[in-house]
Amino acid sequence: MLDPNKLRNNYDFFKKKLLERNVNEQLLNQFIQTDKLMRKNLQQLELANQKQSLLAKQVAKQKDNKKLLAESKELKQKIENLNNAYKDSQNISQDLLLNFPNIAHESVPVGKNESANLELLKEGRKPVFDFKPLPHRELCEKLNLVAFDKATKISGTRFVAYTDKAAKLLRAITNLMIDLNKSKYQEWNLPVVINELSLRSTGQLPKFKDDVFKLENTRYYLSPTLEVQLINLHANEIFNEEDLPKYYTATGINFRQEAGSAGKQTKGTIRLHQFQKTELVKFCKPENAINELEAMVRDAEQILKALKLPFRRLLLCTGDMGFSAEKTYDLEVWMAASNEYREVSSCSSCGDFQARRAMIRYKDINNGKNSYVATLNGTALSIDRIFAAILENFQTKDGKILIPQALKKYLDFDTIK
């Protein structure tokens, strides 16, 4: 959440930055008008309370003064009305504020959509085939790796059931991801059923309510990303400054409606309602957030390098970043059959945006004051998509899949055929 005082006192700057994030200008104007009304109501309420306090002293001395008693009764009703008006305007102002995204860091390129993203680097050698490579969906079917029909029978479309060697390969990918980062990040195993407050704290609600699965007739949701659980481990807590930074990781199942995926690739294991990934999260002082982001994206890249998968790094523009992010890098892996890069990681610094919503602070060692921490999150990596990338990039002419060297220690086979 943005700091309402900064937004109010430096409106022109915030208006420019929020318009760069594709925020509707009408909503900004509505916030300013509601904020003015809220402060006016508060001022009138405070004056009425002061008057009531003075009047109460007079009534105490003149208990039989009917005029004073009538005036006191009338003032109490006025205070109640003013209090209701203040709360109403405060709630509207808060709701508007919760729908504003974070403002972009100064190093982020301005743009409306993904066409303005910047490609910063490419790593790895793309495979060269003397045959037409098959898409991972076809390889899954030919090699009996994923029982798409059985998953559809059990759950519906865009769910998958990995079989035998595919399940083992997925586990090997997961183990590699954890092992490469376990020396830096404390590992957690977390619940996937979460409450509404946790989703609000990280910025998934109210903005993306149509993309999360809500459990019917309950106050619970299925987690869309492990970022939610990891960030909320410290909701309403205060760190000692010397305990920062904190690095956490978790691997698990995530659930999304993918409401806006019409026209996007949904076949195979790329865009699923239920998917697996390893998540990285950091808590640090705000002035260190961008340097911590650079380190985090390198932590994600090392997995792609270990697997010898070609990839590129993108710096996302203002119009393509996630709601809570101030700066985001995407890592995209090469998909040999479709001849394109596909996202497997998104690493973001959120500044104090999430911490302000979740009330996560630290106590300054010098002055003893409490300040908001910065939070960072990154996927390292999407397990189902890495599975797809391995199939496409490590396939052979005779229909086999070669296992990347980095995964062989986790498996009792080195080819899938």
Curated annotation (Swiss-Prot):
InterPro entries, A to Z: aa-tRNA-synt_IIb, aa-tRNA-synth_II, aa-tRNA-synth_II/BPL/LPL, Ser-tRNA-ligase_type_1, Ser-tRNA-synth_1_N, SerRS_1_N_sf, SerRS_core, tRNA-bd_arm
Location(s), subcellular: Cytoplasm
Domain of life: Bacteria
Protein function: Catalyzes the attachment of serine to tRNA(Ser). Is also able to aminoacylate tRNA(Sec) with serine, to form the misacylated tRNA L-seryl-tRNA(Sec), which will be further converted into selenocysteinyl-tRNA(Sec).
Residues that coordinate or bind ATP: 256-258, 343-346
Similarity section: Belongs to the class-II aminoacyl-tRNA synthetase family. Type-1 seryl-tRNA synthetase subfamily.
Protein's UniProt name: Serine--tRNA ligase
GO annotation, biological process: selenocysteine biosynthetic process; seryl-tRNA aminoacylation
Gene Ontology terms: cellular component: cytoplasm
PANTHER family referenced in this protein's UniProt entry, alphabetically: SERINE--TRNA LIGASE, SERYL-TRNA SYNTHETASE
Keyword Oxidoreductase: no
Pathway membership: Aminoacyl-tRNA biosynthesis; selenocysteinyl-tRNA(Sec) biosynthesis; L-seryl-tRNA(Sec) from L-serine and tRNA(Sec): step 1/1
Species: Mycoplasma genitalium (strain ATCC 33530 / DSM 19775 / NCTC 10195 / G37) (Mycoplasmoides genitalium)
